[in-house]
C-alpha cells in the first residue's frame, strides 16, 4: 500500500493562499489546491497499488476543511486518515497503521512500472514527464543530448531515471503550484550514478546537494553539561 501524506496548509498554499494566511479557514483555496493531491492519487493508481491519504493534522485545521478533503478523496475511492503522531506520539498514528494493514490484507496490488528500463533515455524521460507530471513533453538542451549520447556509447543508458526537480511543483518551475497543464519539462543535464544504479536527469535550477534548508536544524541542537540533548524538535 502507498501512504500519501498531505497537509491542509500545503494544499491551501497550492490553492493560492499566502503563507501568513494559512491558519485561516479557506475552503475555496483548499478545493483548488487539492488538484495537486488528486494528481498524486492518479499517479499512484497508474502503478496499480492501493493507497490511503494521511492528513498530517495541524491545530489550525478545521473540521470543514478535513471533511472537504475526505469528500474529494472519497470520489476517487480513497480513504483519508488523520495522522497526529507529532502531537500524540505513537497513539496518534494508530488509525493510519490499522488502515494500512486493512488495505494490505483486503485490497489487491498489481504493481507495474510505467516504462521499460531498456527504452531510450528520451523515451523514459518523456513517459515520466507526461504520465507523472502532466507535461506535454520534454526538451533536452544541447549539452544534455550530448551527455545522453555519451551514456549510450558507454552502455549506461539502460537504467532507471531519477529526476532532480523542484519539490514544489509538477513543473520545473517552483512557482507553478497546483496541477498545471500546458507546459514542458526541460532537461539541462544528464549524468549517471553508477553505484546507485540510476541515471539522474537535472531540471530547472535544482541542486542535488546539499539537501539542507537555509538554516539546518543542527544549528539549534546542543548537548548540555549533564548529557541532555536539546533542540531535536
Enumerate the predicted regions with their spans.
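Cap/lid and interdomain-hinge subdomains that line or gate substrate/regulatory clefts
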Residues: 36, 50-51
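Structured loops at beta-to-helix junctions and adjacent beta-edge loops in soluble globular domains
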Residues: 7, 164-166, 203
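Inter-motif core of Ras-like GTPase G domains
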Residues: 1-10
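Hard-cation-handling environments
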Residues: 40, 45-48, 55, 60-62, ...
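Aromatic/hydrophobic pocket-lining residues that form the small-molecule binding cavity
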Residues: 30-33, 37
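C-terminal effector/interaction modules appended to NTPase cores
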Residues: 29, 168-233
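Structural beta-sheet core signal
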Residues: 4, 53-55
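A solvent-exposed, charged loop/short amphipathic helix patch at secondary-structure junctions
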Residues: 9-30
